[in-house]
């Protein structure tokens, strides 16, 4: 049985500025298996976010192939990519991107509304369950301004997980948090990965936190290198 959730083969990405090609990614190969926790390290501007966007179908590669759940992903139409993304992927960002006028539970319910598969009653139940998993069911009716930074990020994690995706792509999810809250968020993501069997790909600059992952890669000058494989 093929347990590869997300992969890319010989992926390159370049931009053209003033008639000059600038290579961001160079022949990147990566394979994410079910339940794996993978960290990608790199300096600012090394292409980490670009790689995450290409893997998530938010940006197109200049060359190479991306596969999601065994199906070619990068060459699909915009609508097909969106459907595949909504079904199989969740996203967490450095900035929580919660809607300020919505409560925690309403923010978590947004992905469920996009799928159009659940009644409001079902959505409330699912959102409450995942908020309980991240320890915030008692804050369900609070708006983002009434939550701490760590609590907002927990809501963002709940929102990413509520549709039970196969893989979470997280871009510097603890970048705006202090070390204690960062440790707590990383521990939570590890626990949720174990509980749900969800794969996590986490872009971070924090080597200490990255050391918690099964695999650690480093992106240097657009090339991805495997640093540690503890599987």
From Swiss-Prot:
Q: Where in the cell is it found?
A: Cell inner membrane
Q: Domain ABC transporter spans what residues?
A: 6-230
- What's a Gene Ontology MF term here? ATP binding
Q: Does the keyword Cell wall biogenesis/degradation apply?
A: no
Q: What's the Enzyme Commission number for this chain?
A: 7.6.2.-
Instruction: Relate the assembly described in the record.
Output: The complex is composed of two ATP-binding proteins (LolD) and two transmembrane proteins (LolC and LolE).
Q: Which NCBIfam families match?
A: LolD_lipo_ex (TIGR02211)
The name this protein carries in UniProt is Lipoprotein-releasing system ATP-binding protein LolD
Q: What is the organism of origin for this protein?
A: Francisella tularensis subsp. holarctica (strain LVS)
